[in-house]
């Protein structure tokens, strides 16, 4: 079991928190992490590319000239692909680039990135992040007290709306919950700021 220092909002030590080795103490599997990150980045692609084929291009309903007797090549529409302004053949159509990996693979990737952050001392545990109202300045003070000045992913428990609203407008700060934090977000962050309640939820889901 790994022990990490537990801080309060003012940056003072509030004890120790014991992390489950099954979630935060495994040997990171870089291959699985890579596969999951590629999958999540693929899902972020918009895939809205499109062109018009001959049925979608405006016009071209009338045969441009009669079939025989003109000496010209036969044509059925001025929107055929060989015409300037005609439809595109086999062009791109809107599609989703996303694909799903097995749940076991996704969970192993999450455990791997969490374990890596703990091993690199980039995991900051805080007893709670409680605010009486959404105040960005107050959250900035919390980060300063905890000496966090780089890219950070804040992982909260469900329902902590004021903390989420206080943090989301700060530069280099991203907010997630224990159940929505992604492998991509965790790997992209320099530090993790995790509440004690969120740690319990992460262990409940992944252990």
Curated annotation (Swiss-Prot):
It comes from the Bacteria. GO terms for cellular component: ribonucleoprotein complex; ribosome. Keywords: Antibiotic resistance, Ribonucleoprotein, Ribosomal protein, RNA-binding, rRNA-binding. Pfam families: Ribosomal_L4. GO terms for biological process: response to antibiotic; translation. One of its GO terms (molecular function) is structural constituent of ribosome. Residues 49-78 are annotated as: Disordered. Part of the 50S ribosomal subunit. One of the primary rRNA binding proteins, this protein initially binds near the 5'-end of the 23S rRNA. It is important during the early stages of 50S assembly. It makes multiple contacts with different domains of the 23S rRNA in the assembled 50S subunit and ribosome. Forms part of the polypeptide exit tunnel. Belongs to the universal ribosomal protein uL4 family. PANTHER family: 50S RIBOSOMAL PROTEIN L4, LARGE RIBOSOMAL SUBUNIT PROTEIN UL4M. This is Large ribosomal subunit protein uL4. It comes from Streptococcus pneumoniae serotype 4 (strain ATCC BAA-334 / TIGR4). The gene is rplD.
């Amino acid at each position: 079991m790994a022990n990490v220092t537990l801080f309060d909002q003012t940056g003072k030590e509030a004890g120790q928190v014991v992390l489950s080795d099954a979630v935060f103490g495994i040997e990171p599997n870089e291959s699985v992490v890579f596969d999951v990150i590629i999958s999540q980045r693929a899902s972020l692609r918009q895939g809205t590319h499109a062109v018009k084929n001959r049925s979608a291009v405006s016009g071209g309903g009338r045969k441009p000239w009669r079939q025989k007797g003109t000496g010209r090549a036969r044509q059925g529409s001025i929107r055929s692909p060989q015409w300037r302004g005609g439809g595109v053949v086999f062009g791109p159509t809107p599609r989703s680039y996303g694909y799903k990996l097995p749940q076991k693979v996704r969970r192993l990737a999450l455990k791997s990135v969490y374990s890596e952050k703990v091993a690199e001392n980039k995991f900051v545990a805080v007893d709670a992040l409680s605010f009486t109202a959404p105040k960005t300045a107050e959250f900035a003070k919390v980060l300063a007290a905890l000496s966090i000045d780089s890219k950070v992913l804040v992982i909260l428990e469900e329902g902590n709306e004021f903390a989420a609203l206080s943090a989301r407008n700060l530069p280099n700060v991203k907010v997630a919950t224990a159940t929505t934090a992604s492998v991509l977000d965790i790997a992209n962050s320099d530090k993790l700021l995790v509440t004690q309640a969120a740690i319990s939820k992460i262990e409940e889901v992944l252990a």
